[in-house]
Amino acid sequence: MMQVLLVTICLAVFPYQGSSIILESGNVNDYEVVYPQKVTALPKGAVQQAEQKYEDAMQYEFEVNGQPVVLHLEKNKDLFSEDYSETHYSPDGKEITTNPPIEDHCYYHGRIQNDAHSTASISACNGLKGHFKLRGETYLIEPLKIPDSEAHAVYKYENIEKEDDAPKMCGVTQTNWESDEPIKEASQLVATSDQQRYYDHFRYIKYFIVVDHRMVEKYNGNLRTIRRRIYQLVNILNEIYLPWNIRAPLVGIEFWNQRDLINVTSSAPYTLDLFGKWRASDLLNRKIHDYTHLLTAIVFVEQILGMAHIATMCHSELSVGLVQDYMPSEHVVAAIMVHEMGHNLGISHDEKYCNCGADSCIMYPQISIPPPVYFSNCSWEQYQNFLTIYKPDCTLIRPSRTDIVSPPVCGNDILEQGEECDCGSPEKCQDPCCDAASCKLHSWIECEFGECCDQCRFKPAGTECRGIRSECDLPEYCTGQSVDCPIDHFHRNGKPCLNNNGAEKGEFQHTGGRY
């Protein structure tokens, strides 16, 4: 039975409340102080697990602006893949890879009771650190560095003093795909039941992060500090993508603690190109994953905070992005990470007519304070079009689960250890491949998802699975024995196409996007 931790936080007026203070997020000119007092209350029949340091579920009661709130938190059990690893280098350049224990981690998602639009992302490693959204406003909480004190500061983003007022951009100049025609055609189609199921299925982006040498130096070589920062960044990223049924478990971190393995320069396009080539030729040979970010402390020219390719998720060389560790605030840097990953998922910058119900949306070309947490209606349509046209099926492969603390619960719509599938209760299950009563796949199925899969069976041989996308392209057809569409074929080099220009390489050119 899941444990529930009840912590009562008593709000006290701090003597220096309202004065400026230096916190991890920067200089804060207005804040409240809270003193968390932990009270543990186990449900009847529950047993305390001595080996578990951080509970699966926690609940906090406290006040904000004199109003009582109840914060519910649940451990993010999709934060890591089971084969999570870390790599750093010895002084002589030797690669050292370890598999740290990550089952009993301290990173949570949550919500405010009686606030349907609330969200929260909290680290409970050393006190409470993170953010929560309450009645449309975002608050941050972090421990105050006072010896022998449980004092925490609660404050708003607008109370963080800005060090630089210059607008920080996603330096993208053109985010459309090679041709807008397939997008327009796709957006005019009514999704079939199979397509809608393909859209709605959980996506798992196996996520890898590389930390460049400048960032290691920025944190004085303290890999433990960088590691915890990255864990919270990825926790926030997952919180933002969860409404889209996207999860991004962290499969690994590589620290370039001795030197950079590529030439990281202030030119974002140049660095992105080198990083993609290195990933394809080196990193993918050592670690299977879907997507890689280079987290850097370099300052890119033209106020650029990040850059990524467009519509390239699952591509060996182009499924990458750059992110500058721009501010102490983890939420701001996480918003840049979400934005750049969005480009790889086929999403362009928002136009003025796009709407997400907030002042600023994730794919707005400039970063805003407080950072955005919602995608716009335009982003959702572009993402669905990307799934329809490019079919990034690497994101359908489920990573190994790390949840070894709680037993699986069949029917909760969460795939857990020992389950082959979990589509919810028998009344709500919409997956024809899954037996909702047993959470096992039906014995007769041949496939679940894929370009050549229909209603859990292979599509007949000869069924077109990839149409012609340019004059140089050729159609591909299902074999009747596999879910995969055959490799993309093109006219031989030299055959006149594309306005009589010779076919060359046979690859779509993807436009780079900069945040």
Curated annotation (Swiss-Prot):
Annotated ranges, domain Peptidase M12B: 203-399
Cysteines paired by S-S bonds: C314-C394, C354-C378, C356-C361, C410-C429, C421-C439, C423-C434, C433-C456, C447-C453, C452-C478, C465-C485, C472-C497
Motif (D/ECD-tripeptide): 471-473
Entry's Gene Ontology BP terms: proteolysis
Bound cofactor: record note: Binds 1 zinc ion per subunit.
GO (cellular component) term, any one: plasma membrane
First-level EC class: hydrolase
One Gene Ontology molecular-function label: metal ion binding
Glycosylation sites: N263, N377
Subcellular location: Secreted
Signal peptide stretch: 1-20
Binding site for Zn(2+): H339, H343, H349
One Pfam entry name: Pep_M12B_propep
Catalytic site positions: E340
Residue numbers covered by the propeptide annotation in the UniProt entry: 21-193
Tissues and organs where the protein is expressed, per its UniProt entry: Expressed by the venom gland.
E.C. number(s) listed in UniProt: 3.4.24.-
Cofactor annotation: Zn(2+)
Family: Belongs to the venom metalloproteinase (M12B) family. P-II subfamily.
PANTHER family in the cross-refs: ADAM A DISINTEGRIN AND METALLOPROTEASE DOMAIN, DISINTEGRIN AND METALLOPROTEINASE DOMAIN-CONTAINING PROTEIN 28
Function in brief: Snake venom zinc metalloprotease that possesses hemorrhagic activity and degrades alpha chain of fibrinogen (FGA). May inhibit alpha-2/beta-1 integrin (ITGA2/ITGB1).
Subunit structure: Monomer.
Note: The disintegrin domain belongs to the long disintegrin subfamily.
Protein name: Zinc metalloproteinase-disintegrin BA-5A
